[in-house]
Amino acid sequence: YQCKRQIEVMDEKNYQTILAQNTIKEKLLNQRQLLKNISKQKKLPSLNTYTHTIKTITKSLMHEKNVDTMRGLEGIAAKEYFDAFKVILANTGWNWLGRSRRPAKDKVNALLNYGYAFLERETRLAIVATNLDPRIGFLHCNNGKKDSLVFDLMELFRQPIIDRFIMNIINRKQISPDHIKKNKQYGYILDETIKATWIHLYESYMEKPLQSLEGMSPREYIRNKVKNFSYNDIVNIG
């Protein structure tokens, strides 16, 4: 029933617009919250400029009805958010050249790319567990070439789970820049010798309850959020 209802909802432009707006809004709120937390922890008041800009973009988003324009606002906010990393990572020994996917142009991007690959798996498992079709989404293109719903719902978890985790391991010096090597084909990647350490740190983090996630562990939070999406935004929408 979930799959049939999912197809009906995703074919309805009005519902698709509502889901896209709500998802991007939550992503922008997550970006602001993480920057505010880091600003407080590391005493970096200059981050307030970035959080204020993202807040302004969020206000524009709430007046928008066109999904393509919403994606554009999401992109502007993402650039602002990642520009803040140069402030956060100053004097840490980690260089930041701006967000780059594949190939990763610096070592922090290598950590982000690796972390998001783990998040993709977590999100896909949560979606399959709710009997939704991971290929049918509302924000990313439904062209059959990738699991659109996985990438749509991942947007809810990047900042509060993966970015937070990566900032933690950098601050605690649990992984050093020396553990990341340059590869001709893929840019910067994690050295094989550190992957076991990464997995240990990641699994420990994913199972630990966090106050910022309503007292749930990150893994539990993902599953709960996707389950609620299936029930509230698909089965009972409209």
Predicted regions and their residues:
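Active-site helix-to-loop segments that bind/position phosphate- or nucleotide-bearing substrates
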Residues: Q2-G238
